[in-house]
C-alpha cells in the first residue's frame, strides 16, 4: 500500500479542524503547559522554510506534553500593525487592513497545511480593535504611573520611512527594516520610562531559564555602571558641570575633558576665537546617528573650545574639547579623558597631541611594556598600583584599583566635589511613530496644555479611514492632515481638544499578546485574573535571538508594570526561552549584483551559471529573505514530499539553536524514512505476538527519545527513530505492540502519518491525547557497553558494543569508526592499552 501523503494529510487536518482537537480548555484542575511562538508579522511574501523551524519545535513539544497529561495551550496570532503594511499601502493603494487580512489568511493556510496543533479559537491580531483597545488601556496605566511622558529630544529620524525610530531599530547607522539612512532631529515624542525598571530587568534575569548568551545581550544593553559623578568648574564662567566615570581612581590622570557637541554648556564657554570652528563641527556631525558616532574603529575628530576646567583633585587646568564620540543622551554628555588608561582617549590624545599622564604602574608586566606605559607611550587599561596620584590631603599612591576607588569617592563626597553613583546605558524607550498603521494614543490635549486620558468606555480609539498614507516629510504623521479627526469637541468636558497624531510603535501590541491569549474573547477586561493566574508564566517560548533587546526587553518591562499594578501574579512572563538558529541558503548574483532565482541556476565544475544567459554567477550563503530570492516556500515542498517530511527535515538538519544550511533535495531523505515507517506498519509481517528483542528495541527507543525531548534535541531523537527502524525491520515478524510505541514516539514529529498508522492498527482514539508509552526498566538492561577510545591520551570517541569483547574486536571497531578514523589517519599504532568493558587507549607512532 503506497504512502499517499496528500490524501493522508488532508484527511487528518480536516479531522483535527472538525473536531477542534487542539482547543485548550481553562481546566484549572489539570496541570497546564503554555508553549508559545514569537508570533509573526504577516508579510505579503508568506512563510518560508526558515520560519518553519521554530514553529515545528513548539508544535513537537505541545504534542508531546499533551501525551504527558498536561492541559496544553498552544496559540497563534498576528503581529499585524507596523511599517511594512503601510509601505505596501503606499505602493499599491490597498488599505493596510485589507492587505494585512489577505496576508493573515495566507499564513493561516500555510500553518494549517503543516499540521501545527494550534488552538485557533484563541487567534488574535494586534490590529484588531478588540485587541488594541486593551493595548491603549495598558498605555493609560503607564501614564498614570508616571512612566509615559512627552519630551523634545534628539531622535533617530528616517526620511525614507518618514518616522522616528528607537536606537534598537537601527544598525550601522541605517534602519534594520530596509537599510534606510537615519539622521538626528529634535522632535517632541512620547517616551516610556523603561529606565525606572533597569535594576529589576537585570536582577530578574537570574529567575529565568534563558540562554546565557541572550541574557548577556540584555545585560550589556542595560549597561549598569558603578562609579561616581565628579564636578568640574569652567575657569572663566565658573559654570559647574558633572562627569560620570567608572574610574574616579584615575582623576589624577585626566588631561582633557570632552563635551558632546550638543551640550548646552558649549555655547556658554566657547572662546570667541573658537566659535566658528565649533559651529562648523556641530553642523558637520548633526546628521550622524549614535552608532556612527561611537564606532570604535573610525578616526577620532573634535574641536577645542578654547575653555579650561579645573581638576578638583590637583587644581590643574584641563582643556575642554567637543567630539562626536561623546553623546548627550549617555551619562551627562561629558567625559573626563584619561588617555594613559583608556584606548579611545589614547587615540584622541595622540591625534591632537594632548598630554598622556600615567597613574597606574603595571607592576606585573614585562619591563619593556611597563616602561612604555610609565612614559606615556602605551595605553594600559588594566590594573596595577597607583602612581603620580597625590596632592594635598589626598594620596592614592601605592594603592590598588579597589582601594583607590573607595578612597577617592569618599574624598569627593567629603569635599562636595562629587558622589558615588550608578548609571545605565539603557535609554528611555522612544514610543511614538509618525505613521498611520498603528495604535493611536488614547488621550486628548487641550489648549491650556493639559491632557485627559480616555476612559475605558471611550476605547478603542480607532484611526480614521484615509487614502493617503504618505509621511508629510516634516516629521509629522499622515494623521495631521485629517483635521476633523484631530480637532474635536471633547464630549466629556465640552472643551476644544486635539488628538495626538502620532501612533504607537509595532512593539506595543507584542508587549502583552501572551496575556491576551489566556482570555482572547473577554470584552470586559484585557484578561481575567483567574485565567492569568492559571496559564502564566509561559512555560516555553521559542523565537529568534534578534529580539533580545527589542521585544523581549519591552515585554518584560510591560509585564513588571502590570505586576506592580496588580494585574499579573508573576515577576516574569517567559520562564523558559530558546532561540532557534537561522536557516540560511545559497543566493546568487550576476555581475550587476542582481539576485537570480535558484531555478535559473545550474552548477558546473563547482561554479554557478545563469541557465538563461550562460553568465557565471557569484554565490554565497545568506539568511533567507525575499530580497535575495533564496527564501524557499514550504508550499511546493509540502506538495511534493509532504508536511511530515518537511517537519522532520527542519528538525533533522541540526541542533535547534544552531544555524543550518537549507538543501531542498535533502528533504527526500526524511521522506524515505517515512516511506519505510509506513511500509513497516502496513506490512504482512505485523503480528499480535510479542518478542523480547522487539520489546527491547521499543522501550529503548521511548527511553532515549524522552531524554532528547526534555532537552529539545530533536535531531538526535529523529536519528534514534531511524536507527530503530533499521534494527526493527531485521526482525522476522513485527510485533504490533512495538509499532504502536514507535508510532507514539513519531507522532509529535510526523503527526499525519502517525494518526494514519494508529488508525490502521485499530488503536482507540486520536493519538493526540493517548498517554506516552511507559518505559519498563527490565527492557533497558542490555549487555551493551560504551567503550571510551583515547588516542595519544585524548578522548577521541565513544561507541557501544556487546559486553565482554576482546581487545582485537574493540580495536577493529575503533579502526572502522569514521569519527575515530580521522585521528588515526593511516598512522602506525605503537601501543594499545585495553581495559575490558571500559577503555581502549591507542598510542600512535
From Swiss-Prot:
It is an enzyme of class 6 (ligase). Keywords: Aminoacyl-tRNA synthetase, ATP-binding, Cytoplasm, Ligase, Nucleotide-binding, Protein biosynthesis. GO terms for molecular function: aminoacyl-tRNA deacylase activity; ATP binding; leucine-tRNA ligase activity. It comes from Protochlamydia amoebophila (strain UWE25). Its EC number is 6.1.1.4. It catalyses: tRNA(Leu) + L-leucine + ATP = L-leucyl-tRNA(Leu) + AMP + diphosphate. The keyword Ribonucleoprotein does not apply. InterPro entries: aa-tRNA-synth_I_CS (IPR001412), aa-tRNA-synth_Ia (IPR002300), Leu-tRNA-ligase (IPR002302), Leu_tRNA-synth_edit (IPR025709), M/V/L/I-tRNA-synth_anticd-bd (IPR013155), Methionyl/Leucyl_tRNA_Synth (IPR015413), Rossmann-like_a/b/a_fold (IPR014729), tRNAsynth_Ia_anticodon-bd (IPR009080). This is Leucine--tRNA ligase. SUPFAM superfamilies: Anticodon-binding domain of a subclass of class I aminoacyl-tRNA synthetases, Nucleotidylyl transferase, ValRS/IleRS/LeuRS editing domain. One of its GO terms (cellular component) is cytosol. ATP binds at residue 626. A motif ('KMSKS' region) lies at residues 623-627.
Amino acid at each position: 500500500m503506497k504512502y499517499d501523503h496528500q490524501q493522508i494529510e488532508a484527511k487528518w487536518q480536516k479531522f483535527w479542524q472538525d473536531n477542534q482537537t487542539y482547543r485548550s480548555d481553562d481546566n484549572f484542575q489539570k496541570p497546564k503547559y503554555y508553549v508559545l511562538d514569537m508570533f509573526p508579522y504577516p508579510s505579503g511574501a508568506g512563510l518560508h522554510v526558515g520560519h518553519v523551524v521554530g514553529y515545528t519545535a513548539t508544535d513537537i513539544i505541545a504534542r508531546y506534553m499533551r501525551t504527558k497529561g498536561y492541559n496544553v495551550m498552544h496559540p497563534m496570532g498576528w503581529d499585524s500593525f507596523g511599517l511594512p503594511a503601510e509601505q505596501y499601502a503606499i505602493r499599491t493603494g490597498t488599505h493596510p487592513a485589507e492587505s494585512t487580512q489577505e496576508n493573515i489568511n495566507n499564513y493561516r493556510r500555510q500553518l494549517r497545511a503543516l499540521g501545527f496543533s494550534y488552538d485557533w479559537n484563541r487567534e488574535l491580531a494586534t490590529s484588531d480593535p478588540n485587541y488594541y483597545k486593551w493595548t491603549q488601556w495598558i498605555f493609560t496605566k503607564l501614564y498614570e504611573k508616571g512612566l509615559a511622558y512627552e519630551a523634545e529630544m534628539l531622535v533617530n529620524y528616517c526620511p525614507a520611512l518618514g518616522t522616528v525610530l528607537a536606537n534598537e531599530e537601527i544598525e550601522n547607522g541605517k534602519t534594520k527594516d530596509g537599510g534606510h539612512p537615519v539622521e538626528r532631529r529634535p522632535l517632541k515624542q512620547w517616551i516610556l520610562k523603561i529606565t525606572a525598571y533597569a535594576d529589576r530587568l537585570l536582577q530578574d534575569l537570574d529567575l529565568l531559564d534563558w540562554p546565557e548568551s541572550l541574557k548577556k545581550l540584555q545585560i550589556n544593553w542595560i549597561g549598569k555602571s558603578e562609579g561616581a559623578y565628579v564636578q568640574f568648574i569652567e575657569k572663566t564662567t565658573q559654570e559647574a558641570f558633572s562627569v560620570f566615570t567608572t574610574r574616579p581612581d584615575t582623576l589624577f590622570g585626566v588631561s582633557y575633558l570632552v563635551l558632546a557637541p550638543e551640550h548646552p554648556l558649549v555655547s556658554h564657554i566657547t572662546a570667541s576665537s573658537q566659535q566658528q570652528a565649533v559651529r562648523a563641527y556641530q553642523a558637520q556631525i548633526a546628521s550622524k546617528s549614535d552608532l556612527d558616532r561611537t564606532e570604535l574603529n573610525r578616526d577620532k575628530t573634535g574641536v577645542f573650545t578654547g575653555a579650561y576646567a579645573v581638576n578638583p583633585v590637583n587644581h590643574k587646568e584641563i582643556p575642554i574639547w567637543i567630539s562626536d564620540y561623546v553623546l548627550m543622551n549617555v551619562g551627562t554628555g561629558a567625559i573626563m579623558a584619561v588617555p594613559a588608561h583608556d584606548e579611545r582617549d589614547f587615540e584622541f590624545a595622540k591625534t591632537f597631541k594632548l598630554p598622556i599622564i600615567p597613574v597606574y604602574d603595571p607592576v606585573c608586566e614585562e619591563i619593556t611594556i611597563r616602561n612604555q606605559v610609565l612614559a606615556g607611550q602605551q595605553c594600559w587599561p588594566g590594573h596595577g598600583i597607583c602612581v603620580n596620584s597625590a596632592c594635598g590631603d589626598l594620596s592614592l599612591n601605592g594603592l590598588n584599583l579597589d582601594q583607590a576607588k573607595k578612597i577617592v569617592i569618599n574624598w569627593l563626597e567629603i569635599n562636595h566635589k562629587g558622589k558615588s553613583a550608578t548609571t545605565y546605558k539603557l535609554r528611555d524607550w522612544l514610543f511614538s511613530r509618525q505613521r498611520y498603521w498603528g495604535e493611536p494614543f488614547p488621550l486628548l490635549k487641550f489648549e491650556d496644555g493639559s491632557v485627559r486620558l480616555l476612559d475605558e468606555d471611550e476605547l478603542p480609539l480607532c484611526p480614521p479611514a484615509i487614502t493617503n498614507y504618505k509621511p508629510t516629510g516634516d516629521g509629522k504623521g499622515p494623521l495631521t492632515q485629517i483635521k476633523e479627526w484631530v480637532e474635536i469637541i471633547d464630549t466629556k468636558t465640552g472643551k476644544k481638544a486635539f488628538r495626538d497624531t502620532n501612533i504607537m510603535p509595532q512593539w506595543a501590541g507584542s508587549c502583552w499578546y501572551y496575556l491576551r491569549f489566556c482570555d482572547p474573547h473577554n470584552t470586559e477586561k484585557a484578561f481575567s485574573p483567574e485565567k492569568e493566574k492559571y496559564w502564566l508564566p509561559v512555560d516555553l517560548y521559542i523565537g529568534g535571538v534578534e529580539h533580545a533587546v527589542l521585544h523581549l526587553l519591552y515585554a518584560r518591562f510591560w509585564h513588571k508594570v502590570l505586576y506592580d499594578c496588580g494585574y499579573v501574579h508573576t515577576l516574569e512572563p517567559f520562564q523558559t526561552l530558546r532561540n532557534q538558529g537561522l536557516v540560511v541558503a545559497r543566493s546568487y548574483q550576476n555581475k550587476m549584483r542582481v539576485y537570480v532565482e535558484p531555478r535559473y541556476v545550474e552548477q558546473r565544475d563547482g561554479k554557478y551559471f545563469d541557465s538563461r544567459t550562460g553568465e557565471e554567477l557569484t554565490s554565497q550563503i545568506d539568511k533567507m529573505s525575499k530580497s535575495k530570492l533564496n527564501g524557499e516556500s514550504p508550499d511546493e515542498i509540502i506538495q511534493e514530499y509532504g508536511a511530515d517530511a518537511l517537519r522532520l527535515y527542519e528538525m533533522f538538519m541540526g541542533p535547534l539553536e544552531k544555524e543550518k544550511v537549507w538543501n531542498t533535495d535533502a528533504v527526500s531523505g526524511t521522506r524515505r524514512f517515512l516511506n519505510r515507517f509506513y511500509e513497516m506498519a502496513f506490512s504482512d509481517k505485523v503480528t499480535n505476538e510479542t518478542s523480547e528483542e522487539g520489546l527491547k528495541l521499543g522501550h529503548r527507543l521511548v527511553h532515549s527519545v524522552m531524554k532528547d525531548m526534555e532537552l529539545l534535541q530533536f535531531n538526535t531523537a529523529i536519528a534514534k527513530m531511524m536507527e530503530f527502524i533499521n534494527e526493527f525491520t531485521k526482525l522476522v515478524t513485527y510485533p504490533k505492540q512495538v509499532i504502536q510505541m514507535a508510532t507514539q514516539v513519531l507522532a509529535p514529529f510526523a503527526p499525519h502519518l502517525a494518526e494514519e498508522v494508529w488508525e490502521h492498527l485499530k488503536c482507540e482514539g486520536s493519538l493526540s491525547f493517548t498517554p506516552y508509552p511507559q518505559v519498563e526498566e527490565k527492557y533497558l538492561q542490555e549487555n551493551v557497553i560504551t567503550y571510551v577510545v583515547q588516542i595519544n591520551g585524548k578522548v577521541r570517541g565513544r561507541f557501544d558494543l556487546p559486553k565482554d569483547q576482546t581487545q582485537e574486536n574493540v580495536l577493529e571497531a575503533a579502526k572502522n569508526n569514521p569519527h575515530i578514523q580521522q585521528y588515526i589517519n593511516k598512522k602506525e599504532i605503537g601501543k594499545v592499552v585495553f581495559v575490558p568493558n571500559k577503555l581502549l587507549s591507542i598510542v600512535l607512532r
